[in-house]
Amino acid sequence: MKYYIYPCSSQKDAPYLIFSSGLGGHASFWNPQLESLSTHFNIVTYDQEGCHQDSALLPAHYHMCDMANQVLHLLEHLQIHEFHMIGHALGGIIGMELAKQLKSSSITMLSLTLINAWDELDAHTQKCFDARIALLASAGAEAYIRAQALFLYPPAWISQNHSHIKNTEDIQLQGFPPKTNVFARLKALMHFQLQ
């Protein structure tokens, strides 16, 4: 697993902040926030399992617990005993699952900030995921990636940021993971319910 540590620039004993990305799974999603937040925190970002072109295939019964375990193992490896966490969409759900697992651990999650996460999938999000799955299955990775902005952003923002979006999409296409991994991650995400 690839992970990245950005030490706090202003204090040696700063708290840790773990960033967890959405469905794309790449640590680089958080790059725009690193400069300002690393003045207050030691930041850790990571690439989620199965999100790279050369990734091993994920198991057939991949689950949110597996994604949370990845973070737990990272915390143990880095010997982080207390931390804050910010998760976007899937990353927030990983945080919720991790919080449940940490109840029986000596590691403490001090706070969890959720951005566009949910406790149970609603009908609109289900429809978006169904469309994305159909695109990937029927039309392939390029259609899946090129349509992604339509599910995420308002039209005016897309028009104003078209070049940036296209560059990002081109990069995503070059490193697109195995389809089965995308389907496994989507299935785990779609079946999550906070209990």
Describe each model-derived feature in a short phrase.
Residues 2-57:
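Conserved HGGG/HGGXW glycine-rich cap/lid loop of the alpha/beta-hydrolase fold
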Residues 16, 40-42, 81-84, 108-111:
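Structural signature of beta-strand start/N-cap positions in the alpha/beta core
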Residues 21, 83, 87-92:
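Conserved alpha/beta-hydrolase "nucleophile elbow" surrounding the catalytic nucleophile
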Residues 29-32, 36, 66-73, 97, ...:
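Alpha-helical elements of Rossmann-like donor-binding domains used by nucleotide-donor carbohydrate transfer enzymes
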Residues 35, 44-86, 97, 101:
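Active-site loop/oxyanion-hole signature of alpha/beta-hydrolase fold enzymes
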Residues 80, 104-107, 194:
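Helix N-cap/coil-helix junction residues
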Residues 96, 100, 109-139:
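Flexible "cap/lid" loop of the alpha/beta hydrolase fold
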Residues 123-125, 142-195:
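Conserved alpha/beta-hydrolase catalytic His-Asp/Glu region
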